[in-house]
From Swiss-Prot:
The lineage of its organism: Bacteria, Pseudomonadati, Pseudomonadota, Gammaproteobacteria, Pseudomonadales. One of its GO terms (biological process) is alginic acid biosynthetic process. The gene is algF. This is Alginate biosynthesis protein AlgF. Together with AlgI and AlgJ, forms an inner membrane complex which probably interacts with the alginate polymerization-transport complex and adds acetyl groups at the O-2 and O-3 positions of mannuronate residues. Acetylation of alginate is important for the architecture of biofilms and increases the ability of alginate to act as a defense barrier. It is found in: Periplasm. InterPro entries: AlgF. Keywords: Alginate biosynthesis, Periplasm, Signal. Residues 1-29 form the signal peptide. It comes from Pseudomonas fluorescens.
Length: 217
């Protein structure tokens, strides 16, 4: 049996195919608008945490990381791995970014900016509490009453972390058995990393949670 394709049937078929293409392209465009551009394989990811009391702007190479308010952070921006010049405020530092790695560029209230590596968190069932201790003393993150260790002793200039169940919790930093500062309550969400950046020295330390901006999650 043979089928004859009439001009009218052929026109309908082409019109249907064209319509489906338009729908597919529209859906793709909608996804791009919703999720933003997809980072190419081998990209590096960088954000800024501004630990100072003044707004700063930052660039890494030719990538603008936007204006960042005091004690706030930008979202991650991606770029090819490699060697770059990072400018934050009036200071410029060389940085080396490895492919498929995440980093936070910290603007300190005094001293040069610091590039801190942020290993990605991939457990969708738990929350991650990470302490980036940029202070000059070892610190332990505990529950506010001091009874339970959440992240045990993190060395000065070191990093410590722990996966926990999603919860809203009040915490504090301890130097041994001595409380050195309360930490703002934080709501820990499933699949999310909450990073506590501790800057300063001596008795003047500043603990601030750094999380991705709500509008970009």
């Amino acid at each position: 049996m043979t089928f004859t394709t009439t001009p009218r049937r052929l026109a309908k078929t082409l019109a249907l195919a064209a319509g489906m293409s338009v729908v597919s392209l529209s859906a793709f465009a909608g996804d791009a608008a919703l999720y933003g551009p997809v980072a190419p394989k081998g990209s590096s990811f960088v954000r800024v945490y501004n630990a100072s009391n003044q707004e700063v702007s930052a660039t890494v190479g030719s990538t603008n990381l936007s204006e960042v308010a005091p004690l706030a952070s930008s979202d991650f921006s991606f770029m090819p791995g490699g060697d770059y010049s990072a400018k934050i405020g009036s200071q410029t530092v060389p940085v080396k970014l490895a492919a498929d790695h995440y980093y936070t560029l910290v603007n300190n209230s005094s001293g040069q900016p610091q590039l801190i590596e942020e290993p990605p968190f991939k457990n969708k069932q738990k929350s991650l509490v990470r302490v980036q201790n940029l202070s000059d003393k070892a610190l332990t993150l505990k529950t506010a009453d001091g009874k339970t260790d959440v992240v045990k002793s993190v060395a000065a200039k070191g990093r410590g972390e722990r996966e926990i169940n999603p919860v809203k919790v009040s915490l504090a930093l301890y130097d041994g058995d001595k409380k050195v500062g309360d930490v703002k309550p934080v709501a820990l969400e499933r699949g999310e990393a909450a990073v506590l950046y501790v800057t300063g020295s001596g008795s003047s330390i500043s603990p601030v949670w750094v999380k991705r901006p709500v509008s970009t999650r």
